[in-house]
Amino acid sequence: MGSSFGDLFRISTFGESHGGGVGVIVEGCPPRLNLSVESIQAELDRRKPGQSHITTPRKEADQVQVLSGLLDGETTLGTPIAMVVRNKDQRPGDYKDMAVAFRPSHADATYQAKYGIQARSGGGRASARETIGRVAAGAIAKQLLKQAAGTEILAWVKRIHNIEASGIDPQRVQLSDVEANIVRCPESAVAERMVERIEAIGREGDSCGGVIECVVRHPAVGLGMPVFDKLEADLAKAVMSLPATKGFEIGSGFDGTLLKGSEHNDAFLPSDDGRLKTATNNSGGIQGGISNGEPIVIRVAFKPTATIRKEQQTIDSDGKATTLAGKGRHDPCVLPRAVPMVEAMVALVLADHLLRQQGQCSLW
């Protein structure tokens, strides 16, 4: 329960952080899609641990193995695509103290309360290693969207702690800009300050959070359903299912509450190709729950990493007061590695809605 996502383009992830491996089964991918396994691996490389000194030092190759669903390793058959990544660098001993004391703001206590048992080593399904399956599946969804609709999805770090990049143009930013530094912020000068802040907070044995911004360029028009399956609602659910997420906004977001209707409304403009075009994009590319063809722009808030080296007050499994200083290898800030996770979840939502749109509205 709770490990599957999507309707027509549907994924199911499996595995624990310190188990034999993690992976995903993708169902509903159309046949005859030219699929690059190298592109899947490239997305996983952006997510994997140990890629810089500001991420967890856990060393994992995160090499994907595609078990089914492809012809000659490059063409989808329309059958389930199964992918697995083996865990290689587990250290269960790092979690000895956490086996008897709950980590504040982590899933330890709530998993124990719900199930009466928990995978204490590595956090089990609450670990960010679960997102390997999402990123692998999202890489397939990205390729489907690009080939079928010309859609591009790109995310970047907008804020770390209280350091924010305010000059990024979602229409112009490129992947090379995002990947130019280890924090994945396109503004190089701001990125340097972000890295310094993560380093300083990490030296204190503490952690920090921030905001990731994501743009969808050239989205198909008409994606989304009225009422309960609005596109922004499904996007919110998707990204808010990622570990450590605490907030979501689209378009003008909460700042839009400071505007009057005459200031916030996106005026329609004539276009030569018959597509909808607006003078502004406060709606973030979605109106009435349905995409209008303008860029979809969202922002996602991530809390500080829960497991920190600083000693904290907590309780043990018997409910008695104790203290805990986290051990193990954890990111002082999840934002740099969360960028491909956000892109993946956005891609999964759009791929699912693209298939739903084709199935309902393209018969005649």
UniProtKB/Swiss-Prot annotation:
FMN binds at residues 125-127, 288, 303-307, 329. CDD domains: Chorismate_synthase. Reduced FMN (FMNH(2)). Keywords: Amino-acid biosynthesis, Aromatic amino acid biosynthesis, FAD, Flavoprotein, FMN, Lyase, NADP. GO terms for molecular function: chorismate synthase activity; FMN binding. One of its GO terms (biological process) is aromatic amino acid family biosynthetic process. The keyword RNA-binding does not apply. Its cofactor is FMNH2. It holds the Pfam family Chorismate_synt. It catalyses: 5-O-(1-carboxyvinyl)-3-phosphoshikimate = chorismate + phosphate. InterPro entries: Chorismate_synth (IPR000453), Chorismate_synth_AroC_sf (IPR035904), Chorismate_synthase_CS (IPR020541). Gene3D superfamilies: Chorismate synthase AroC. Pathway: Metabolic intermediate biosynthesis; chorismate biosynthesis; chorismate from D-erythrose 4-phosphate and phosphoenolpyruvate: step 7/7. NADP(+) binds at residue 47. This reaction introduces a second double bond into the aromatic ring system. Belongs to the chorismate synthase family. PANTHER family: CHORISMATE SYNTHASE. Homotetramer. This is Chorismate synthase. It comes from Synechococcus sp. (strain CC9605). The lineage of its organism: Bacteria, Bacillati, Cyanobacteriota, Cyanophyceae, Synechococcales.
